[in-house]
Curated annotation (Swiss-Prot):
The keyword Ribosomal protein applies. This is Small ribosomal subunit protein uS12. Pfam families: Ribosom_S12_S23 (PF00164). Keywords: Methylation, Ribonucleoprotein, Ribosomal protein, RNA-binding, rRNA-binding, tRNA-binding. GO terms for molecular function: rRNA binding; structural constituent of ribosome; tRNA binding. One of its GO terms (biological process) is translation. Signal peptide: none annotated. InterPro entries: NA-bd_OB-fold, Ribosomal_uS12, Ribosomal_uS12_bac. Part of the 30S ribosomal subunit. Contacts proteins S8 and S17. May interact with IF1 in the 30S initiation complex. With S4 and S5 plays an important role in translational accuracy. GO terms for cellular component: small ribosomal subunit. The modification 3-methylthioaspartic acid is found at residue 89.
């Protein structure tokens, strides 16, 4: 525990707050164009082929976004909307692509949590 004199000489330093989603620039969503759509494998102990896309945003940032849900129609030059939110077992993936917006189709045959996957209400 420092003395009063020590604190006067050298005050306490506040911890630096790091932005977890710098490319968003304080916006809830951003638009971008897919430059590459591919699959990648997660960290240990998980095993899968996770669908991701490299996206060039309207503000010039190049980010990697996760494509949630089963199946997708994305390819190079698809225009997508992204939101913040990382994928814990994929290093470097800090954004999610929003399904059912712009060129991204919603997940077909989705019955529950439809709003998260851009699926319409079944008849």
């Amino acid at each position: 525990m420092p003395t009063v004199n020590q604190l006067i000489a050298k005050p306490r330093k506040a911890p630096v707050k790091r932005n977890k989603v710098p490319a968003m620039e304080a916006n809830p969503q951003k638009r971008g164009v897919c430059t590459r759509v591919y699959t990648t494998s997660p960290k240990k102990p998980n095993s899968a082929m996770r669908k991701v896309a490299k996206i060039r945003l309207a503000n010039g940032f190049e980010v990697i976004g996760y494509i949630p849900g089963e199946g997708h129609n994305l390819q190079e030059h698809s225009v997508v909307m992204i939101r913040g939110g990382r994928v814990k077992d994929l290093p470097g993936v800090r954004y999610h692509i929003i399904r059912g917006v712009l060129d991204t189709q919603g997940v077909k045959s989705r019955k529950q949590r439809r709003s998260k996957y851009g699926a319409k209400r079944p008849k």
